């Protein structure tokens, strides 16, 4: 008998090195993993744990005092530069929040995801593991009342306060996740920091960055600080900066403020040989305990630290908030040089001794300041230069703009202001928060519903309009949704996916009802959709009441940043069987991505698609996927006929199929890829079979209503 190599009978591979998962065998199959991430089985907290309730018990004053004390409590295992951890903590917060991109709302500081791969091991996040370990005693002390996500975001804000900046405010309420995010596309590259011309480049054409990406390279948060592809050229770097920050929803003034404010304090580290650094946290030895980038061949701390490879401080006084960044940048001429680690950077020509920053360990030693290629862009690019000179002339204005931009950076993915918690929430409503006024709550729902019913609007029109209003919701950054009824405003009512003519006709009926009954249009739209579902269920033989929560408000054009909202325009909607155009990505993959953003599960997606097909909500009333003889009734016919082996499916064009009777060949229905995926994909078929069962007709209706209600209330953060 041969000796076994491993004494453990694994159910599956427990490391990725030698595993062959289903996706390796069948790479073209549709993976539903992004819909099942952050399952309760990964969460160590009790099922009834509510972080929003728990954080309200936090001693906010004590926490702030503890963080202030931490800033100057230098630890021998990772000493603070100049005795102050401010620069390190600001970088920690920056690099957590800075992953946000407006295109899909993913990334950002909202979930504490920097604790996990890949972010914890990105080259650009070098040595931020040290910052999190420095924060651990505080996290340990405050426990469940303080999430890692809130602590990481708060640390940088307090760091600025401790160095003299009057901050704009701070809000708590970010809830931790417990394993890496699966839904975020960081790029197709297989290696870190590859130049533009790599085989899996994120650029096309002259320099067109792939959507939804914002960073210029795999493993970077923003741009390459040494220059485009590591080649110094401030004007070219300025183009990258402008594109990257725009994709983070920042304008030129905010970009200059954030760049300058981020580099007013702290320093970059490159005083040594980067080749001597150990592996990143995810690849570190087990005895390193998640500590990465260890310099085991040298002292590797203090003045000998190597992180980015760039070496030096930007300002004369790197532990105080002042206008020194612009003084240093604009009052000197600069020349290219290389750091001790071999990185490109810029150094001032003929700088006075008194203008040099001190050594991080010995104040009697002066050091040469530096600027990155990105900093030089603030001087060389004409528009950035104007803003920089304005900030230099008016330090108070610079501080004001920066503090607001910092607040925006650290809160952009938190959603509406109603989600903000804590004593330092700013009173002012900001346009980028997508404000929505509170709507009337106390009205007779039955009377309004009766008025809607008497209009004679079709089931399809009522359900479709409510769906189109709600489907803009993104769980990633908590934007969009039915609250606010922005579907009736100038921008959204012209979106192709909203069928402008049909929408205008429906709104012309619903808006007078809202006005005459003193309720919001937002509530009337949702209530009409609910009524449509109830009528469709009645046609199928079920008397149901769709749950309704009043209180939605109506936003105005003045409350809406059209440029920011433009990214919410649907370019596809598998639920309504619609593509604005043909895309390189398959229709079913697009539906999966949209489903994840809306916060739905795979079985919720399944039941909603099946129900909406038979109700008749397809875009432009196309017949694809309407597998029923009882259109308008909420039946399980879609699933019954999809799983019926009396039919055969044939492609007749791109994303178009016909369903024929197997024996006669007679054409019965037509379908899209989105329809057929529920019979083709083995997991989705298993759900389809559940809803096709003879004993699950009531379950189908109940589950549809549950998923529908979830969507209608997805953005109701004002209710529990």
UniProtKB/Swiss-Prot annotation:
Instruction: Give the E.C. number(s).
Output: 1.11.1.21
**GO terms for cellular component:** cytosol
**Which Pfam families does the protein's record reference?**
peroxidase
What cofactor is needed?
heme b
Reactions mediated catalytically: H2O2 + AH2 = A + 2 H2O; 2 H2O2 = O2 + 2 H2O
For the biological process aspect of GO, one term held by this record is: cellular response to hydrogen peroxide
Q: List the disulfide bonds.
A: none
Q: How is it modified after translation?
A: Formation of the three residue Trp-Tyr-Met cross-link is important for the catalase, but not the peroxidase activity of the enzyme.
This protein's record includes keyword Heme: yes
Q: Where does heme b bind?
A: 263
Q: Where are the catalytic residues?
A: 95
**Crosslinked positions for Tryptophyl-tyrosyl-methioninium (Tyr-Met) (with W-94)?**
222-248
CC cofactor note = Binds 1 heme b (iron(II)-protoporphyrin IX) group per dimer.
Gene3D superfamilies in UniProt:
1.10.520.10, Peroxidase, domain 2
| GO terms for MF | catalase activity; heme binding; metal ion binding
Q: Which UniProt keywords apply?
A: Heme, Hydrogen peroxide, Iron, Metal-binding, Oxidoreductase, Peroxidase, Signal
InterPro entries to which the protein is assigned, alphabetical: Catalase_peroxidase, Haem_peroxidase, Haem_peroxidase_sf, Peroxidases_AS
What residue range is the signal peptide? 1-21
Role this protein plays: Bifunctional enzyme with both catalase and broad-spectrum peroxidase activity.
- How does this protein assemble? Homodimer or homotetramer.
Which family does the record claim for this protein?
Answer: Belongs to the peroxidase family. Peroxidase/catalase subfamily.
Query: Which PANTHER family is this protein grouped with?
Result: CATALASE-PEROXIDASE (PTHR30555:SF6), HYDROPEROXIDASE I, BIFUNCTIONAL CATALASE-PEROXIDASE (PTHR30555)
**Protein name stated in the entry:** Catalase-peroxidase
Q: What high-level taxonomic lineage is stated for the organism?
A: Bacteria, Pseudomonadati, Pseudomonadota, Gammaproteobacteria, Alteromonadales
